[in-house]
Amino acid sequence: MNDPLFPLPDATESLVARVTAAPRVQRPNRTQLQLRPIDLEALLPPAHRARVVWDFVEGLDLSPLYQTIKAVEGHAGRSAIDPAILMALWLYATLEAVGSARARARLCEEHDAYRWICGGVAVNYHTLADFRVDHAEVLDGLLTTSVAALMAEGLVALTRVAQDGVKIRASAGGASFRRGERLAQCLAAATAQVGALREQLEADPGAGSRREVAARRRAVEERQRRVAEALAQVPGLEARRRKAGVKGPARLSTTDPDARVMKMADGGFRPAFNAQLMTTTQGQVIVGVELTNAGTDQGQLHPMVEQVRRRYGGGPTEVLADGGYVDLDDLRAVAGAEPGCKVYAPPPGADDPTRAHRPLWRVDDALVGEWRQRMATAEAKAVYRERAATSECVNALARNRGLRQLGVRGLRNARAVLLWFALAHNLMRAAGLRAAGAPAT
């Protein structure tokens, strides 16, 4: 009498069914075509660093770059990429420690900040790589005008500056260094190889082989050029080594003839360049940039003071440098080029008593005597302490932004990379100084 109208499922059976059933998930469908609106302006917040970089670039005078563009209105030809885009891409990537042109080209397709800077303009790695090193003179001028603008606003003053050198690993290996005799053999071999490839190219093979042979020929010609440059520098390097009393034959790199083996910060010896930066202690703005292949900092003080005077129409009042810059001729040159300029550097013997009695410093010189007396005062020691807080901070930022090993070769190209870093550093300092609004003292 209590039988149900239809059979009911057992409670245990339904529980087992629920437990053993396949989970329901959303699977990716990568073949589905989608149309999505893209608002590049909405990709970045208002205070994003890319916007700061773009505002800085818009304030620069890029007319020398625009004058090199051959495509003009009313004539045939493909439109060129706006130099402001390339300038902003390199500055922003420098701040983000991205040093490879290929990596930056990929980021222009994948990263929102780079896509915002490009604004829909396609940029390839070859264009980026060429732009990095082709306009060193323009970058040098932009450094001067941008710092001069800060000086006009009262945010930067050349009253007190600090100079320091930082060793940057060159794009060359230690095994690439050869003596003069070996360089001559390498040049003869490269010349013969270029001739053989030229004959092979003139034989007119298939189109594919012709392109391959042409690429190989360009690579060998580039090596031939570098070896010839290295061989031409051998006599001058040997003369400098004899003057300095260095024994042994001179060796130069077949990969980068301008690189020199230097003692690095970790105590090792590797091919490198010596980057010289002069920075204001108030605001930490880079006002002078130079790149040399000298292994020491001696003799670098006067050229940098002269560069700053030439850039801004007046040199610094006080210069702070470490003991590696102490050179009698350099101190005299600074005093002669910029009267009234005081050099704050530790005298010989401050950290090494054995150096205090060398003949070079046992001279009856009023300049040396005044310098020693000044550095013995508590006031001078307090001023000198600002050197580490300025130069070492800038050097650390350089390392953090990828200025450890160069991806280019040659002094000129390496100096262009250093100028990119200086401009990127200064644009962030300018943004901070303008936000603070504190006048320089």
In which residue ranges do the predicted regions lie?
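Hydrophobic alpha-helical membrane-insertion signals
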Residues: 2-51
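Basic, short loop/linker segments at the boundary and entry of helix-turn-helix/winged-helix-like folds
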Residues: 44-91, 96
